[in-house]
Amino acid sequence: MWPLLKNNVVRTGRRYAVFQPRRFTPRPQHDAFGTKDDVRGFTVFSHAACGASLMDPLSPSRWEVALFPSSPPSLKDSCHLCAWTFGLAGPCAAWLSTRRELVGGFSKIIYIQNSAECWSVRETKRCCRICRWRSTSSSTDLRSNPYPIRWCYCWTMFPPMYPVLLLTASPVPTP
């Protein structure tokens, strides 16, 4: 788990609340969606990249963004950010341990440390197909899940044992 750095909550041009670990250095970022902001070396994907698949069904007014130190080429193929889903996973999907912290009164940060079961390329591709299908489930199905803020993780997106940070936030109020 990365330590909570409360002083590193910033606002981007799109008024995103961003958590920035200090260990990564800035670098150029690219993505396949065109819905990103580059913040101190992270690529910030908004919920617009995948629509409702990144909305919290229990609190639709919130949105989620995923922060990645780099944007792998695999994001351009069939297994991309839309593969993440609420607490629903196939047999080869990895469950991630999470904890939540409130920052600045408006941001909720979820730390994610992987505990993967997907290792081979073949298993990974099957996992991603399952996750994408599950992400289209109805809001009723998602609401029935007792753990709405848990995510399916597909290994084609990142190397094994790669820490990923997910930020759940409300829009930052305009002063």
Swiss-Prot record:
Domain of life, per lineage: Viruses
Name of the protein this chain belongs to: Uncharacterized protein UL21
